[in-house]
A protein has these predicted regions:
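Generic beta-sheet signal
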Residues: 11-12, 107-116
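Short, solvent-exposed aromatic-acidic interface loops
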Residues: 168-177
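Short glycine-rich anion-binding loops that position phosphate/pyrophosphate groups of nucleotides
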Residues: 118-120
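Conserved beta strand-loop-helix elements of the APE1-like EEP
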Residues: 111, 156-159
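Active-site-proximal alpha-helix that buttresses catalytic centers in soluble enzyme cores
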Residues: 1-2, 6-95, 99, 103, ...
Length: 177
């Protein structure tokens, strides 16, 4: 360890923070914004993300996801790559594109943050499971709906040596109101 170290990078999967309730929203679903709690959660998430310093940020283009990553992106002058495949509609229509988006993160080798929605998480988690080093590790991934609560993140540490294999996975809840 002293000479080589453990060479990993994080891939962080975030469920957007608390949005205004669907029942109280009459405009387009992709325009539904964060609730007050969600805005506070997004600020807390931005502070927490500094522990991993993701330099690549991908997000669903839907407003609540973009608003979730905005405090972090703005603080560090990063850009958000909006991916339709990470939206609810995109993942429903083209789940293979969603899986490909996630798989590409393992090929890049850079710290990354992905923000998406609860209904997209099963596709995302299936794509993540392809990069586990052992089948036993799957028990450490969220397995039941809602998978992640609003604002939760799944932090994956990915090995540079094991073909993009995941060496650890942890769910972190940055804020509760």
């Amino acid at each position: 360890w002293a000479t080589s170290g453990l060479d990993t990078h994080p891939i962080i999967i975030a469920r957007h923070t608390k949005a205004k309730p669907r029942a109280n929203w009459s405009a387009a679903e992709d325009e539904r914004p964060l609730a007050g709690t969600g805005k506070r959660q997004a600020l807390a998430l931005a502070r927490l993300l500094t522990a991993w310093e993701p330099s690549r940020v991908l997000s669903s283009p839907w407003l609540r996801c973009v608003q979730t990553v905005a405090p972090y992106v703005n603080e560090y002058s990063l850009t958000v790559k909006e991916k339709k495949s990470l939206s609810e509609a995109g993942a429903e229509r083209h789940p293979k594109r969603t899986a490909k988006t996630i798989a590409s993160l393992f090929e890049k080798g850079t710290p990354a943050l992905v923000c998406t929605h609860r209904p997209v998480l099963p596709v995302v988690l299936d794509a993540v499971a392809e990069h586990l080093l052992t089948k036993k590790q799957k028990e450490h991934l969220p397995a039941k709906d809602p998978y992640l609560e609003p604002g939760d993140i799944l932090v994956l540490q990915v090995s540079a040596y094991e073909r993009g294999g995941i060496v650890s996975a942890e769910v972190v809840r940055p804020f509760t109101d």
